[in-house]
Amino acid sequence: SMAIGDTKTLGKVGIKTILFYLLTTAVAVSVALSVAMLINPGIGVTIENVSTSSVTITEKQPLTQTLLNIIPKNPVESLATADMLPIIVFALFVGILLAKMGNKASTVANFFSQFNDLMMEMTMAVMKAAPIGVFCLIARTFANIGFDAFVPMLKYMGCVILALAIQCFVVYQLLLFLFTRLNPFKFLKKFFPVMNFAFTTATSNATIPLSINTLDKKLGVSKKISSFTIPLGATVNMDGTSIMQGVAVIFVAQIFGITLSPSDLVTVIITATLASIGTSGVPSVGLITLAMVFQSVGVPTEGIALIMGIDRILDMLRTAVNITGDAVCLSLIHISEPT
């Protein structure tokens, strides 16, 4: 933000960037849900031997009630009951006010920032032991369900990969061509080294310097804008992660025989979109927020164990899609805000 200098320009760029990221994330989740419901990856898995006594399925609500419930009535109660949408909205509201207050709220802002860093460090420490836990969970799952679950898991992977491909090579490139008239094939050729680096590292944060340099040297995008937009995208733009979450919700819901209503699908789109805001660009972070997406529509979080074992490969693909979305957004902003 310091690189842009002019606060008026900063505000315009910031608003356009965030709106683009939120819009493409909502589209990404919609694509994921559509692909998953078309392929039905969880159909055919039997779970008669899996105990569901601890599974709580949320009572279905009308769409209007779902939208009204986004507004937090009591943030403390929402935290206590793990009602994720009001919590996210309240957190966003607090963050906006802290940003508006500036230095006057620096102590509170620093506390939340450091507390978030602490939680992320704690989470990543736990994630280091995840392979052992995942092995045990998968072993138990296959003991109950059987190895017939391999085919649905491959279908799940296929759904995620197909949705990622649609988002990256259709949605992004269509937006790029319509608003900038850039040749999508030339764009992909020039940006491919960054996509490849993101794929191998599975972290958006590590690609920030390479993205900025590539966009500047090969695509002629101003560093003044890219130095603000790209780091913001590494935190806010998680289209690939949202796609995984959309497919995972349908996959696990079908395994447990849960029918999601239209209002549930809208809730998934809203929750996954809002959950992407503030998500760190580190490997497999999408699994951390996946639980809140499941909880928002009453899908059992136990189902996450099924997909954790194959998530690393998909995480690499998701990261490549995420940073491509950042670059497309920056190209659009560059055209509308020439510097």
Which residue stretches match the model-derived regions?
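Juxtamembrane helix-boundary/capping and inter-helix hinge elements in multi-pass membrane proteins
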Residues: 2-9, 44, 101-106, 114-117, ...
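Signature of multi-pass transmembrane helix bundles
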Residues: 8, 16-188
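Membrane-interface alpha-helices at helix entry/exit sites of multi-pass transporters
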Residues: 9-16, 124, 220-232, 263, ...
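Membrane-water interface of transmembrane alpha-helices in multipass transporters/channels
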Residues: 11, 147-155, 182-192, 258-267, ...
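Transmembrane helix-bundle signature of multi-pass membrane transporters/permeases
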Residues: 17-22, 93, 114, 157, ...
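Hydrophobic transmembrane alpha-helical segments of multi-pass transport and channel proteins
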Residues: 22-26, 30, 161-166, 198-203, ...
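Helix-loop-helix junctions within the multi-pass membrane cores of secondary transporters/permeases
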Residues: 194-276, 330
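Residue-level detector of conserved catalytic or cofactor/ligand-binding positions
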Residues: 331-339
